[in-house]
Amino acid sequence: MHNPTPRTESPSALAFIKRFFAAEAAGGLILMAAALAALIVANSPLADSYFAALHTVLAGMSVEHWINDGLMAIFFMLVGLEIKREMLAGQLASWSQRALPGFAALGGMVVPALIYVAFNWGQPDTIGGWAIPAATDIAFALGVLSLLGKRVPLSLKIFLSALAILDDLGAVLIIALFYTSDLSIPMLLAALGSIAVLVALNRLSVKKLLPYLIVGALLWFFMLQSGIHATLAGVALALCIPLGKPDEEASSPLLHLEEKLHPWVAFAVVPVFGFANAGVSLSGITVDKLLDPVPLGVALGLLIGKQVGIFALAALAIRAGLARLPDGSNWGQLYGVAALCGIGFTMSLFIGALAFPGAPELVDEVKVGVLIGSVLSALLGVVVLRRFGARG
C-alpha cells in the first residue's frame, strides 16, 4: 500500500506567508475579517452561543470584560511604547515634525466630537459618547492605505502613522479624564506607588524587562480596583520602560518589547477585540433607528468630522507656514488620508463601551454608527487617493 509523504509548504508558499505577515496591511486585513466574522455570527443561528460566551464569567469578570480590560491593556502598552519612541527618536522628535500631524490630530478629535454633540445636545443619556468618533484606527487605516501600493508616497504613510500616534495619545487622555468611575482611594494610592516603583526602575537604569512587567501587572490590578480604567496601566508601564541611547539600539528594552508585542497585538489581541465587540444583531435595525442621535452622531462624526477637521487644520498650518505638505504628496492625497482617518473601529468601539456601561442597546447603536462611518470613510479615502495618486 502506498503511503503518501507528508505535505510540506513549498518555498514559494512559505515566502508568500512571510510576506503577508510582514505587510503593513496584514493586521488591518485580519481585523476586518474578525469584524466581518463577528457580524455574520451575531446574525446567524450561532448568535445566542456567541453572546453567551462573551458573558461567561471567569474569575469574577465576564469574558468580554477580560478582553476589554485585560487584553486591551497589552494593546495600550504597545500604543504607549510607540508614543514614547516616536516622541524621543522618531517622527515626532522635534516640534517641526509634530506640527502637521499635531494640528491634524487636534482637528480630527475636536470636529467629530462637536458633530456628535450637535446631534445629542439635550440628551443626558447619550451626550457622554462625544469622544466615540474622535478616534482613528491605525491598523485599519494603514491597512487600507497599504492596499493602494505606490499610488501613495511613503511620506503620507509616515504622516498618517504620526497623526494616529497623537490621536491615540489624545484618546488615552480622554479616557483618563472623562471615563473614570468612582475612585477607591486606597487602590489609587497603591497604583501611584506602583508607578513610583516603575519610575525608580527607569531612573536606576534597570534594563531587564521582567521587573517592569511584574510591577506593571500589579499596577494593572490596582487600577482595575481603583476605578481608573485598567488599560491605562499599559500606557503608564510603557512610558517607564527605557528607550536607551541611539548607539544602544540593539539592547534597547523598549524596542525589544515593542518588536515582541507588535505581532501579538496585530494578529491576536486586536482581532480578538474586534470579534468580541463588532458583533451586533441587525434584525432590529431600521432606517428610523439609523437616524437616532447616537448612530447618526457617530457615523457623521467619523465620515464628515474627521475629514473636515483634519484637512482644515492641516491646511491652516501649511498656509500659515507652520508646516508643509508631506514630501511628494499633493492636496488631494492629503484630503484622501484625512478621509481614511474616519475609520475609527478599535478605539471608537472601546470608548463606546466605556461611555455607556449597562446600556447594551446604546452600545449596539454605537457599533452600527462606527461600522457605517468607518466603511464609508474607507471607501471615500480609497476613491480620492486613487484619483489623485495617479497624478501625484
UniProtKB/Swiss-Prot annotation:
Its main location: membrane. Pfam families: Na_H_antiport_1. The chain crosses the membrane at residues 20-40, 63-83, 99-119, 127-147, 158-178, 181-201, 209-229, 265-285, 298-318, 336-356, 365-385. Gene3D superfamilies: Na+/H+ antiporter like domain. GO terms for biological process: regulation of pH. One of its GO terms (molecular function) is sodium:proton antiporter activity. It comes from the Bacteria. One of its GO terms (cellular component) is plasma membrane. It is found in: Cell inner membrane. It is a multi-pass membrane protein. Keywords: Antiport, Cell inner membrane, Cell membrane, Ion transport, Membrane, Sodium, Sodium transport, Transmembrane, Transmembrane helix, Transport. Na(+)/H(+) antiporter that extrudes sodium in exchange for external protons. NCBIfam families: NhaA, PRK09560.1, PRK09561.1. PANTHER family: NA(+)_H(+) ANTIPORTER NHAA, SODIUM ION/PROTON ANTIPORTER NHAA-RELATED. Belongs to the NhaA Na(+)/H(+) (TC 2.A.33) antiporter family. This is Na(+)/H(+) antiporter NhaA 2. It comes from Pseudomonas savastanoi pv. phaseolicola (strain 1448A / Race 6) (Pseudomonas syringae pv. phaseolicola (strain 1448A / Race 6)). The lineage of its organism: Bacteria, Pseudomonadati, Pseudomonadota, Gammaproteobacteria, Pseudomonadales. The gene is nhaA2.
